[in-house]
Structures are given as C-alpha cells and as structure tokens.
C-alpha cells in the first residue's frame, strides 16, 4: 500500500466526520451514504494498521491538515453579490452561509499574478480530457481556491463547487456551477481529483460562459500590496448558484 492510500483514508475520515456533524442538514438517504462511507473508511483504517498504525482520531486530524486548515465559517462577506444573465434568465450569485475550507496554501498558489502572452490573466479556455469537458484558467497563481461539499436533499446527491479568489484584488475571480454526482463517496473523490489537477476544473459550456463573464468584470492589480503574502489574513468566500426560476 502506498502513502497515497493512507492520505486518502485520512481525508475520507475527516470529510465523513465533518458531514455527520451537520446531521440536521442531511436527508435520510444522504446520511445513510455518509455513514456507509464512514464504516468503509474505518475498515480501510484497520486494514492499513499493519503498515500505518493510527487511531481514528489521528486519521481525522491528519485528514484535516491535508484538507488545508480548519473549516472556516463565511461571515459578513465584504463583496457585493452579483448576477449573470444566460439565455434570458438571470442567475443570482450569493455568498453561501455554509462552511468552506481553503485549498492550496503553498508557495506556487501564493505567488504574484502572471499574465499570459497577451497580458490577459482572465482568459479561460475549454478542452476535453478523458471524456470530461474542462475549463482551464490562464495563469493567475495568486488565486485562492476553495471547495464546498454540501448535500442536496431535493436530488439526494452531492453538490460541489470551486471558487477562485484573487488575493491581489480581494475579489472573486471565477467560480464553477455546482455539479451533481451520484453517490457521496464518489463525489468527494472527484473533488479531491479536481484539487490535485491544479487550475483545471470540470465544467460545461454554460459554466465557461458564466466563468468568463465573472472574470471580465474583475479588475487586476498586478502588484502585491505587501512584499510577503499574509496567509493568515487571506479570506476565502464561497459562492453558491441558485437555480433560476421558471
């Protein structure tokens, strides 16, 4: 077994525990799926005890570290909610009152903005990879990425979304429409794979258009306000996209 297997188990232990802490937000089907994930993760932990002995509590603690920090509560957002128009309908974008976790607090993600050859850091391009349609942003390495996992009782599936937050401008630079996936554990593993793939995010044509619309309205300050980024003061807020009315 590899170290990746151990890390994966620890991540699943942390996520399952955190989701069950919000049991009141889970419908019966989702709660059963998370409980099943917790049970299977504990079984993996026992299997790994021969080469990586640790307690369930240790696995949760390490999983939290791998997830990059304590879960933060999004409070009193300082940025104005926006909306974008698609096919005659307005999609409101609000700051969700749910928990978020900052991702990617390492030097490459905290470096200054790097424009592409045209001097445009907001460009997004689409391409296909292994059957999935992906959006890849052209280099702005100061983006603060976040991931949000929340149950959707109406569809009994897991929704997840990504937000790009520019530390230079203190503004949201882009986001992805929450995607629906069948199965809690499958969905969370997809989230982890997206995180590991850098600034490549699973999306579709509508998501790309909205992403470009948000980015086109953003302003870029190409210089740092401080010589050294202050990670502790970096704030990340999650956007949720409500379904448009009929």
From Swiss-Prot:
Q: Which InterPro entries does the record cross-reference, listed alphabetically?
A: Flu_C_NS1, Flu_C_NS2, NS1
Query: What Pfam families would the database entry show?
Result: Flu_C_NS1, Flu_C_NS2
Q: Which GO terms describe its cellular component?
A: host cell cytoplasm; host cell nucleus
- Superkingdom is Viruses
Whether RNA-binding counts among this entry's keywords is: yes
Chief location of this protein within or outside the cell: host cell
Which keywords accompany this UniProt record? Answer: Host cytoplasm, Host nucleus, Host-virus interaction, Inhibition of host innate immune response by virus, Inhibition of host interferon signaling pathway by virus, Inhibition of host RIG-I by virus, Inhibition of host RLR pathway by virus, Interferon antiviral system evasion, RNA-binding, Viral immunoevasion
Q: Name one GO molecular function term.
A: RNA binding
As for subcellular location, the record says: Host cytoplasm; Host nucleus
Protein name per its UniProtKB record: Non-structural protein 1
Lineage, top ranks: Viruses, Riboviria, Orthornavirae, Negarnaviricota, Polyploviricotina
